[in-house]
Amino acid sequence: MKAVIPAAGLGTRLLPATKAQPKEMLPVYSKPTIHYVVEEAINSGIDDILIITGRNKRSIEDYFDKSYELEFMLQKAGKDRYLKQVRKITDLADICYVRQKNLKGLGDAILSAERHVDGEPFTVFLGDSITRSEVPCAKELIDVFNKYKKSTISIREVPKDKTCSYGIVDSTNIDGNLYKINDLVEKPKASQAPSNLAITGRYVLTADTFDKINQTEPGFNGEVQLTDALSKLDELYGVKFTGNVFNIENRIEWLKSSIDFAMDDDEFRDDLIGYMKSFL
């Protein structure tokens, strides 16, 4: 199964930090955001990855590409630890790129992947969203997809007053964390939201999704919304995710994500805790 990572958005909510660099390249503790997304795909058993980029996104390609000058400098300086880290990035996966020429929404971005997907089921990872859990979020979806052979999305609970920031689902619980999706609404007001279950930013989709996108008129913000296209599918399942989700375009979640990863580092944990306590 192939992975598609949309990463063409401008990141306007993070300006001025994103004026000269993609939001997907903003650092989360020690690595760029999109590095964690690619790692999740790999840990879910996927090594064929298509990243959908746009203007001013060249640094994403440069990051995953081989850097001969940097490797030569590190080798000459005897910095073997850093040389190993740099080479590991290049060898992560087979990554291809395609440009979304016009930013017409997530649905339109996914259409850019149709030729690469070549009629097979595929996964979608939003390039500005990081998930953390014992079992990768996408792996949970793939397992459900392999059982039902129907498009499957990740969902999670969000505060009722935050539904206007997410795609929200109307669903029926089948068993445990498994839901049958009845309808999807893009960023509804709290009073109009069918639930507080939001789409997490991870999907396993069948190839007929492309037909549904082509049949979808521009919706919220005048963009072709993936949620509108998914609502046209005959059958759609949701898996409730219970791990951590960090939407990097939300400033507080971006800050929390770095703290979350830093707390796993024995070298800095105690100093970080002491620093945060100084504000209490």
Predicted regions and their residues:
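Conserved N-terminal catalytic core of the sugar/cofactor nucleotidyltransferase
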Residues: K2-I5, R13, K31-P121
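Cofactor-binding loop segments of dinucleotide-utilizing enzymes, especially the Rossmann-like FAD-
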Residues: A8, G54, G127, R156, ...
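Alpha-helix/helix-capping structural signal
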Residues: G9, R55, S129, A207-D208, ...
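A generic "binding-loop/recognition-motif" signal
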Residues: L10, Q21, N56, T242-N244
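Short catalytic helix/loop segments, enriched in acidic residues and glycine
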Residues: A20-H35
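Conserved beta-loop-beta/alpha segment of the NTase-like Rossmann-fold superfamily
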Residues: L70-F72, D80-S171, A207, N214-Q215
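Catalytic-core segments of class I nucleotidyltransferases/pyrophosphorylases
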Residues: I142-N146, D175-G274
